A protein has these predicted regions:
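Short alpha-helical elements
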Residues: 1-180
């Protein structure tokens, strides 16, 4: 299923006059609550959520280049490294990776550089308690909000992480097919 999804995204990029593969990705994670039936859940202390994390790497249109699902107790940095590790083919041509302040640290940047040739840009907010739109970061937040349109993804009801991954992939496939 992932190969078909990647083909649809590549076709969409070609129609826009871009290359099939992107050289710029934005990476972020979203914590999602789980139901009582779910066995694969962890506790995200930062957001105080017991559940899973969806790690996404999106291109400039907001469509995923890679998706990875982990328990919520996995840090954003470790989840992003796993995301890149399991999807190395998608990150071959990536030159720049934009992340938020949850991914700070020289070790993270070095690990990403050793896996790919991408340069990591950490975008931070200037004022802690003031809302401001950070340029290009809204693209990944929009992608997460698209997932909110699918009732099944509001809360994780799946027993296996791989099933959650497939549900997220199906939601993005439906979104792409609906638009084009």
């Amino acid at each position: 299923m992932n190969s078909g999804f990647k083909k649809i995204v590549a076709d969409r990029r070609l129609r826009q006059g871009r290359s099939a593969r992107t050289s710029f990705v934005i990476v972020d994670a979203q914590s999602v609550k789980t139901t009582d039936l779910t066995k694969n859940s962890g506790y995200d202390g930062g957001k105080k959520i017991s559940g899973i994390k969806r790690h996404l790497a999106v291109e400039i249109n907001g469509f995923p280049q890679a998706i990875h699902i982990t328990r919520a107790n996995i840090t954003d940095r470790d989840g992003a490294i796993a995301l890149v590790t399991f999807n190395l083919e998608q990150f071959k041509l990536v030159r720049t990776m934009m992340v938020d302040s949850g991914y700070t640290g020289q070790n993270f940047a070095n690990e990403i550089s050793s896996l790919t040739s991408a340069k990591v840009i950490v975008v931070k907010r200037n004022e802690l308690h003031q809302f401001s739109v950070i340029p290009q970061r809204w693209l990944i937040e929009r992608s997460f909000s698209w997932l909110g349109n699918y009732h099944r993804l509001w809360r994780n009801c799946e027993r296996k992480l791989n099933t959650s991954l497939m549900m997220v992939s199906l939601a993005f496939i439906r979104l792409l097919l609906k638009r084009y």
